[in-house]
Amino acid sequence: MSKRPYCIGEGLKKGAWTTEEDKKLISYIHDHGEGGWRDIPEKAGLKRCGKSCRLRWTNYLKPDIKRGEFSYEEEQIIIMLHASRGNKWSVIARHLPKRTDNEVKNYWNTHLKKRLIDDGIDPVTHKPLASSNPNPVEPMKFDFQKKSNQDEHSSQSSSTTPASLPLSSNLNSVKSKISSGETQIESGHVSCKKRFGRSSSTSRLLNKVAARASSIGNILSTSIEGTLRSPASSSGLPDSFSQSYEYMIDNKEDLGTSIDLNIPEYDFPQFLEQLINDDDENENIVGPEQDLLMSDFPSTFVDEDDILGDITSWSTYLLDHPNFMYESDQDSDEKNFL
DNA sequence: AACAGTCTCAACCGCCTCGAG
DNA sequence: TCTCGAGGCGGTTGAGACTGT
């Protein structure tokens, strides 16, 4: 073997990087490009291991890294993706242009996790905490605006307002199924233990749909009740996701400024229908007539790393099969979920 | 002003996967 | 086919900043 270890050596420096070291690393990568991290320290004149150089570059020095406060849209994306994917920081970071996995991870651990707990939501399962909410079906409120309000109105906290959004029966049935343990959420991953009496491929797809059902439940219950700002300014939000906002905004006045929306009734099927109608004008749409289960579903629609793009597809399925979560689990030996 | 407690986040640690040899 | 190192990733640490008393 000609390979040499790239992180072993005498007198390697650890700890915080100095400005001088940063300059050397930036200068070297500017001239020679990324890669070959094993050799970079020696060639750049740094007493660091290659791995340390790579981390310093990818997490801090890289020119296209966005730093500073996370926007509301970014926060919502993080929460939604965390609900469905768990601590997959690199996957989440891919949906947030110019954000690093390390930054997303830190932001989650220091800000979002605490706020979810404050609002009575388990940051691991994304379900209401049992101790704070005796009714597991009733969505808890996550107030996206609290952070900005805290400075100005520290004595006011809308999180004390009771959750006021009764979800439709369809969504409630899905959420209650999830809450009752028929789907199991482990370490933030939604893993549907309900076994469907179908072929392996369709079973996997159903479980994908189930996973998305839980995330849409979370995002809707939190987004509708929280304060949303116009999605038009958001960057990187897929169209279908933006449309869900637009629909809500079209139907609820002052959504962008109200904290407690107090929506008396929200018709989830109607929302999905609207979503589909909106999408009919676009390309690459799976219409209600298309059987998501039996077709060779294009892989682009079930890309696990692009779940936001799947909303149209699985919401269409939910509309057609509102009771899919109740389907028989007989005869299934399916073990490869998701 | 001094101290203690808390928070933040850059950096490190260690495990895993992939691919070169 | 096997070995092993590079690179990727998530978890954890700890120094410095911040806040409260």
From Swiss-Prot:
Residues 123-171, 176-195 are annotated as: Disordered. GO terms for molecular function: DNA-binding transcription factor activity; transcription cis-regulatory region binding. One of its GO terms (biological process) is response to wounding. Residues 37-61, 89-112 bind DNA. It is found in: Nucleus. Residues 155-171 have a biased composition (Low complexity). PROSITE patterns: HTH_MYB. Induction: Slightly induced by auxin (IAA) and jasmonic acid (JA). Accumulates upon mechanical stimuli (e.g. wounding) in inflorescence. Down-regulated by sulfur-deficient stress. Disulfide bonds: none annotated. The keyword Glycoprotein does not apply. SUPFAM superfamilies: Homeodomain-like. InterPro entries: Homeodomain-like_sf (IPR009057), Myb_dom (IPR017930), Myb_TF_plants (IPR015495), SANT/Myb (IPR001005). Keywords: DNA-binding, Nucleus, Repeat, Transcription, Transcription regulation. Residues 9-65, 66-116 form the HTH myb-type domain. Residues 140-154 have a biased composition (Basic and acidic residues). GO terms for cellular component: nucleus. Expressed in both vegetative and generative organs. Mostly present in inflorescences, flowers and seedlings, in the transition zone between roots and the foliar part, and stems, and, to a lower extent, in leaves (in midvein and trichomes). Plays a role in determining the spatial distribution of aliphatic glucosinolates (AGLSs) within the leaf, mostly short chained. Together with MYB28/HAG1 and MYB29/HAG3, promotes aliphatic glucosinolate biosynthesis and represses indolic glucosinolate biosynthesis, but could not activate AGSL biosynthesis on its own. Can form complexes with MYC2, MYC3 or MYC4. This is Transcription factor MYB76. It comes from Arabidopsis thaliana (Mouse-ear cress).
